[in-house]
């Protein structure tokens, strides 16, 4: 175990306190978030029209359609399983939480199609505080990792196999 694992709860508390109560802490996190995330991830399709045997014009039409269809999903709050934020806002939240907490998890789920949302993909954000090893529910590192029936280890709420791969 490292010093960070043993002190992560206290480190998160201090970072959040600085973010909420010290203007310089708030500015540092927000400026970093804005500089790194910017307007967010957007598709830039580049179709190899020669390989596909289509014209440049057909490829340009398909590229426009891809951007349009992505925007239908990304600009809607229905991309968020909680129906609160659009994809670009979720990116800002994830990066902000990562800076404050050291990690953030994004789960992919599938909802129902609707007449105004033809895509089922939904994203769920899980803050690092919600991830813990069974028995350490308050996020305090107790120095012990758990071993599963399959021989995998659970360390700080994340299950890994013998090679260190997250499972």
Question: Which residues fall in each region the model found?
Answer:
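Conserved small-residue
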Residues: 24-25, 40
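Intrinsically disordered, low-structural-confidence terminal and linker regions
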Residues: 1-17
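Structured, mid-chain assembly/scaffold modules that mediate subunit interfaces
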Residues: 30-167
């Amino acid at each position: 175990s490292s010093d960070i694992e043993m002190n992560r709860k206290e480190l998160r508390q201090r970072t959040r306190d600085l973010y909420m109560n010290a203007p310089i802490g708030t500015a540092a996190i927000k400026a970093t978030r804005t500089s790194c995330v910017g307007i967010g991830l957007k598709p830039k399709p580049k179709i190899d029209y020669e390989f596909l045997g289509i014209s440049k014009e057909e490829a340009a039409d398909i590229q426009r359609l891809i951007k349009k269809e992505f925007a239908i999903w990304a600009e809607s709050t229905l991309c968020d399983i909680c129906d609160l934020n659009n994809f670009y806002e979720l990116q800002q939240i994830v990066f902000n939480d990562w800076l404050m907490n050291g990690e953030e998890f994004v789960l992919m789920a599938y909802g129902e199609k609707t007449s105004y949302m033809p895509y089922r993909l939904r994203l769920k954000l899980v803050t690092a505080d919600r991830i813990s090893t069974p028995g350490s529910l308050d996020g305090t590192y107790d120095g012990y990792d758990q071993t599963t029936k399959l021989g995998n280890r659970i360390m700080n709420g994340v299950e890994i196999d013998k090679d260190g791969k997250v499972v």
